[in-house]
Amino acid sequence: MGVRPRQRPQRLAEKLLAIRTALGLSQTQTVKSLGAEEMIVPGQVSEFETGKREPSLIVLLRYARLANVCVDTLIDDDLDLPAKLPARAKHR
């Protein structure tokens, strides 16, 4: 039995960019708001937003918390971000 390649979320990059722009943050401010200064540098935010690189699970979790959405919203291509960010209530 072979291992199937993992499917990459197609809309993740656009969602991460949408979160940052909706919150009015620069890439540097995004890193600080995520509390991820020891994990990522501002240039990586650009790579996440263009799809050149995927963030780690912990960074995805922090993006979800920043936007007040569940991680599923970020990685499931069938789910859209709320019209207003940060969202009022988290999905559980």
Segments from the language model and where they lie:
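A short, Lys/Arg-rich alpha-helix, primarily the initiator
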Residues: 1-23, 72
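Short, charged recognition helix plus adjacent turn
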Residues: 1-6, 65, 75-92
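Helix-turn-helix DNA-binding elements, focusing on the entry/boundary residues of the two helices
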Residues: 16, 27, 42, 57-60
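Residue-level detection of the helix-turn-helix DNA-binding "recognition helix"
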Residues: 21, 35-36, 50-52, 79
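Short alpha-helical DNA-recognition segment
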Residues: 24-48
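Base-recognition residues in the alpha-helical recognition helix of bacterial helix-turn-helix
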Residues: 43, 47, 58, 76
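DNA major-groove recognition helix of helix-turn-helix/homeodomain DNA-binding modules
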Residues: 52, 56-73
